[in-house]
């Protein structure tokens, strides 16, 4: 009886999070509504940023492309010193992508393990382990966000299998959709992997582990509120369901990571070879230029997702004029700055090179090869300035207390995207993504 009471008390302390959706939403689901209390979560005090208690198992000596876990198995980079050619650049990109995926997979395994342990025996200790594993997996995935081509891309894109959104759907993470799954207990069924992407993945794990309130984020017209279904669930029952949901998410993320790794591997879909061998008769890309165009589109994650949605919108600089802090990425764990720093590192890996200190072939080598040294130098300076701007900056605190202070960081990232979408794509004869058509920002 005593142990059950302690467990119940711990479970009641667990709660529900906030999300947003840019995809088609179910009727009466509120998209992208700012959180009412974005700083509260788990054992975190209001306003505190989550800091993991353990280092990432993939930590190494700090080299841009080095790995810790599985470093030998993930040693894909074989042509760091190759002279520039389009073919060599595509090979480097393929190897870099495989290396980053190879580093993510053991973190997905660790996340599955820690979430399973938490679901089996909820406690402050198992919660800490689950949170640490989530953070480390998320930070490696923030690197992979820039590699949004091939199997990661949406279905309908060349080689796209839609696997990116299956693992992390930001900014389409949807709190109300998660709460509908909680009420319906779809996480306990065999069709959970068919639930909306905004209710699964790393964004949903954050929701389960960090938010402590027992309210929901759906509109008054949603069935959970309109029919008073949500209020029929006790705080303890809601907490129990969240713990079970977290365990199911771990299995789902691990399965999707395995699919993605296989899609790129020689023993699976071998998309690495598909990318590296682009050209006439290619299975996906009929020319090297077409393949490089797809890769360059990945770089534009920094323009739309980072500059606009991770910096501009929660700061009230674009698309929002009031109560904008709730749009922040990972608003409950409050690690928005870490995410953006990882995104910037990812841009440099893809643009400059995937080796230690960004050695190896990248788009900057292509610029030098065609005599556009000034463009390469301008981008290098912009990257260094953005690194300095975000290095010690607390985005979550700024969004809530002083959103105007984000403007210099936003401007630093805008300088990168301005060079990218004007000089770089013009000189290299690349096409801008469709999302930029008509964009004058």
Name what the model sees in each region.
Residues 1-18:
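Sec-dependent bacterial lipoprotein signal peptides
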Residues 69-441:
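Mature extracytoplasmic or organellar-lumen-exposed domains after removal of signal/transit peptides
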Residues 20-72:
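Ser/Thr-rich, Pro/Gly/Ala-heavy low-complexity intrinsically disordered linkers and tails
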